[in-house]
Amino acid sequence: RKLIGNKRGKRYFVDYLLSFKNTNLAIVEAKADDKDPLDGLQQSINYAQKLKIDFVYATNGLKIFEHSLIEGNGKWIDSYPTPQELFERKFGKIDTKVETTITYPFHLEDGMKPRFYQQIAVQKAIEASANNKDRVLLTLATGTGKTYIAFQIVYRLFQSKWNKDGSNRRPKILFLADRNILKSQAINQFNSMEKDIVEITGKEIRKRGGKVPTNANVFFAIYQSIAENKKQIEKTQEDEEDDVSGYY
């Protein structure tokens, strides 16, 4: 965590992080058997709040205490719930398509893994999209990797074949930037999806006889290109309406 003056905050560690189907479900605070199992519970709850995790367990190997951040209370339990039980307590009963979308893994390349806040941002956007939310707003500070986060969202929606209508096909996604340099930087971030990408530019539209390119799934453009060719793009959207799951 970065602080003012280019300093870094204290690093936090959890004893155990329980994950299932690419989803972080619970934190376990483990103590020796001669210690009070509730020692450190509040600290783990604080960690869970930062990591957007819904369940915390505190144990000394003899007793187990469960705290649910969903319900806002805790209780002693005889045994841990199964991973599937925790998953269903978090998401409820969901259909296979939604589960595929919200559990699809991140794209990992060259040993680069998303930071915890990037994971949270991506996961929340994915969950909202999978549950048919029409609009999702992510507010992120400078230097937090906004383009990387956008790539991970697009990659997971694309690979899991998420669609607003629930059909089994990849979505069409529009990435908008306000400057060409930002658009170019974004395209570089999306290099692993290169074969599925097309740029929408005035030059490209003129080259195609006034037609907007549609032979791709992920489109990159700047606002000016969209504004200058608004009528043609609207016509293309109408013509392609059966195939388009959404523009973003």
What does each of the following model-derived ranges do?
Residues 197-212:
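Functional beta-strand-loop-alpha-helix junction segments that form "active/interaction loops"
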